[in-house]
């Protein structure tokens, strides 16, 4: 199973608006065995013979919290230029769709966001937010999606999503760490859910880049994790990760555990 998605020259039709399943990402073959470093980092390599594109995917422990960093880089190892209009990690095989229980058990948590109404979190059944409840088996063409255009990356939604399986008692969560255009897609493939976080693409952001032989392009930074429990447990793991990442040497977490932001919430920006 590929743990990335890359695309070039894709046909853009309505039923192909989901980001997964395009060439050459769909047909790339793995190169060698995954490389594991100290039990905290794993690297996968893929190659497409037709285009000469090579993709390197690295997952590594973030240090605090049940969170992984995902890095994806595509390099043109061929002899001709190749234009890339989508590159991103993808987290497949998350929760089973084989039984009909997912219709009542799978919840999606997401946050609408504007300047005067920040972090408005919603808890919805995923079948009510884009995923077809009549899905039977195999791949589903329906999906849940958030997106943002431009440099105000939280203008409509926070670049985060939590997929909660209440039947299994676990949650998967993902955060895009980027200040430009992005999209977050949750769908079904091979009887399981996937999460696909992405930076700007040709469809979302009018972005593409032509790679000459030897040139590379990297995906936007992404954090991903899985934990037992629901929304609160997922947010707790992301909070541990953020505090350790933003303030790695600060002892204020023990002495000052609350961060109070009065910019918009109290002073109305005055």
Go through the PLM ranges and name each one:
Residues 84-87, 209, 229-234:
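OB-fold single-stranded nucleic acid-binding module
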Residues 192-212:
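Short acidic, Pro/Gly- and aromatic-enriched capping/linker segments at domain boundaries
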Residues 72, 225-237:
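Short, surface-exposed, low-complexity cationic segments
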Residues 233-270:
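An acidic-aromatic substrate-binding cleft motif
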Residues 209-228:
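Short Pro-Gly-centered flexible turn/kink motifs
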Residues 72, 214, 260:
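Conserved, mostly hydrophobic/aromatic
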Residues 179, 224, 263-265:
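Active-site beta-loop-alpha junctions enriched in small/polar residues
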Residues 1-189, 205:
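Polysaccharide-binding surfaces and accessory modules of carbohydrate-active proteins
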């Amino acid at each position: 199973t590929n743990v990335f998605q890359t695309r070039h020259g894709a046909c853009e039709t309505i039923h192909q608006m989901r980001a997964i399943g395009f060439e050459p990402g769909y047909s790339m073959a793995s190169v060698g065995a995954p490389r594991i470093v100290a039990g905290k980092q794993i690297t996968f390599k893929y190659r497409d013979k037709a285009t000469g594109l090579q993709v390197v995917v690295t997952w590594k422990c973030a240090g605090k919290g049940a969170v992984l960093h995902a890095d994806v880089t595509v390099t043109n190892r061929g002899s001709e230029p190749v234009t890339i209009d989508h590159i991103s990690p993808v987290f497949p095989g998350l929760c089973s769709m084989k039984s009909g229980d997912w219709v009542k058990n799978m919840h999606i948590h997401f946050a609408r966001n504007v300047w005067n109404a920040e972090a408005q979190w919603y808890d919805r059944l995923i079948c009510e937010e884009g995923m077809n409840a009549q899905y039977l088996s195999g791949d589903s063409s329906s999906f849940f999606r958030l997106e943002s255009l431009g440099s105000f990356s939280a203008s409509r939604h926070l670049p985060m999503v939590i997929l909660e399986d209440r039947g299994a008692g676990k949650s998967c969560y993902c955060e895009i760490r980027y200040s430009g255009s992005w999209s977050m897609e949750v769908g079904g493939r091979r009887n399981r859910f996937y999460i696909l976080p992405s930076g700007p693409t040709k469809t979302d952001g009018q972005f593409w880049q032509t790679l000459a032989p030897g040139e590379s392009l990297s995906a936007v930074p992404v954090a991903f994790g899985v934990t037992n429990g629901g929304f609160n447990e997922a947010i707790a793991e992301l909070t541990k990760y953020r505090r350790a990442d933003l303030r790695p040497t600060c002892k204020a977490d023990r002495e000052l555990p609350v961060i109070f932001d009065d910019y918009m919430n109290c002073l109305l920006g005055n």
